[in-house]
Structures are given as structure tokens and as C-alpha cells.
């Protein structure tokens, strides 16, 4: 009779092992789960046993990667190519293996075909396997779930380029266990926010004072508190692309200022002078994929510069050169879409550069969320208002005299007055209680 007794012991040993989270995940996928396959492929297998094994494995994965219990199953069970973590779901994987094995036997062996066709234990086993595998191939089901569920929509683009999923197969050099866990939390929508569905609707507003729901997309892409961190993320990707182009021997201009004859200014991110008097104008953008796909964002980004006014201004700047316009769009959860293929071919981007850009998106996404959480925890929830992005650290604004922390910059006279306050004025709670106060009033005081 198959059981999950050994699985419980193996998972307990896994949690005790002095391994990093990515090593524990690899151990689970490459050793522990495959060891279960032989013992579970028996005539006595039931859906209840397989479901219990899946429950234990889900619990182990969530513990290793610090995932919420509300994490969608599509993140766990979808293949890495389809945007998931590649954990096999035994409840449907084992019956599908048995179904395909019985089909091969009935097709290749006449005796096995006769046994499966006649009444008896073999036919009953085949019928039970057909019921267990009624859903069909599990990977096709989870691929559809990733593409249609709200928190995972857009991850299906991981199938178009290996750079989007390389970090899950081989941990990048220099990454710590914390980096891997935070990247996995970002990919699976587990970074803590107030915009999760189980939080009451009236409490979902951004704690930085925005009139928006505090979702991961808002924090990483729109919140003014993280404005300058988003600029740093963008600039790091631009620097990596520019360094690659210079290494190829191409003259590369970063943020060239291109003026139209009527004074309109255009500042694309890169202008790469390719061979044979050809110039590629490339603008980089990190876009969230929701109702608007990354392919649509790529088209919109191209239209920003691919119009007669810019081409006329570029012709004045680089007379006699052929101008090609091709943007570069990435997803903040580490997605390199298919639409970037044209730009990657023109710039001859290798897999290492693509992977490095993906790693920048993931690590900066983690840093942006961390800075947002530190800000709201330090200053507390702010009233709703339309505030400006916070200035760089230590820099006071010209019109309000406020520092990055949001507190007013004290003038010399205010500092002097603050030093002259008495202890009672500084901390009113330290003053003496009123005479004749009752014991309850003393406690409340």
C-alpha cells in the first residue's frame, strides 16, 4: 500500500539541512519528488494519497520560499518555461504517467491489449486511471491558468526567451539566499502589500498617501515614494546595454539631446552607431503587464519616436545616416518578451546580457518594495494627497524646505527654541498627575 510516510521524513530532513533556499528547492525537485514516482505507480494508488503528498510538498515549498498560504497553485505547478516554479503535481502527474503507459502497452503488445479490453482487474485498473487522469495533461492545464489568472497574467511570456527563467534553473553568481527568495516572492506575487484580495476594501489604499490601491504594480511602477529607485533601475539596464554596445566597438550615445527645428526636444535612452552609416535609436522601459500586454507596450514605446517629427530631427542631427527605431521593454517580474527579438538581433545581445537585465529587474524590484515598506513603516500611513516624488537622500526641496524623510528642515532659530524647551514641555506625559486623582485616572494618565 503506497503511503507518504517516507515523504514526511524526507521533508523534515530537508528543512533541517544547512542549505540555502535555492538549494533546498533544487533538492526537492530533483531528488525527493522523483523518489516518490516508483512507489506511487501501483494499482493501489488513490487520489487521496496523491492529494496528501501534494499538500505536504506545497507546505514545504511555501516554507522554503516564505510564500503565503494564499499563493496561487499555478505559480507552483506550472512549468518553469510557462512562468511557474516547475513543481510536479502528483495528483494529476502520476495518473497521466500511468495512462500513457497503459496506452503504449495496448498499442505495442497484443496480449496486454487483450487483457485491458476484457473484464478483470486490468480493465478495472485502466478505468480507475482514466477517472484519475480525466483532466488531461497537467502542464497544459496550468499553462492556461497562468495566462488567465489575474496575479500571474503575463508570465506566459517566459516561454519566449530563456533569459526570463534562467535564474530559476541556475542561481546567478553573487545572489544570496535572500535575493533568491525575494525574487521568487516577486515572481509569485508574494511581496506584502495592502492591496491583496483578503484585506478589506476600505484598507487597500496606498499607505504613502496615493489615491490608488496598494498593489505590487503600484509600488514598483507608479508610487511617488519609489520614483527615484525606478529611475535607478532603468538607468542600470541602460548602462548594461550601452557597455555591451561599446564592447562591440560601436559608438554609443546615452540620452542624446535631439532638437527639432521648432525647438521640440527628444531624449531617447540610446543611439547606437552601427556599421554602414546605420544608427539604432533604442529606448528602454520597464512595463507592468496587466490588461495591456508587453507586446502592446513595445508598440506604444516605438510610436513615441517612430513618427515624422522625430525622424526629421534625427536626420538633422545625424545627416546621411539611416535611422532605425526599436525599443527594449522588460517586465518588472523578470520577463523578456518576444517583441524584444528585433532589438536583440540588431544589438546582437547575448544570453548573458539578457539574463543580467532580468536580474536587475528582479533585484531592483525587491529593493523598491523594501524602500517603500521602510518609508511607510517609518512615517506611518499618510493622508491621501497628490504629493511629489521624494527628492534624493539628504537633499532639501527648494519650495517647501523638507528633507527626504518628509519632515520640515529645522532652521537655526527653531533648533535653538527646541533646545530651550523644559523637560515638561518636551514630554507632557512626564508632568505630575492632577491632585486628588483616582487610581484608574492615575493608570490612564
UniProtKB/Swiss-Prot annotation:
Region (Disordered) location: 380-445
Domain Reverse transcriptase residues, every copy: 1-114
Residue numbers spanned by region Nucleic acid-binding endonuclease: 115-445
Start-end of Polar residues biased regions: 396-405
MF-aspect GO terms: endonuclease activity; RNA-directed DNA polymerase activity
Regions of compositional bias (Basic residues) in chain numbering: 380-389
EC number: 2.7.7.49
Keyword annotations from UniProtKB, A to Z: Endonuclease, Hydrolase, Nuclease, Nucleotidyltransferase, RNA-directed DNA polymerase, Transferase, Transposable element
Catalysed reactions, semicolon-separated: DNA(n) + a 2'-deoxyribonucleoside 5'-triphosphate = DNA(n+1) + diphosphate
Protein name per its UniProtKB record: Retrovirus-related Pol polyprotein from type-1 retrotransposable element R2
Organism: Popillia japonica
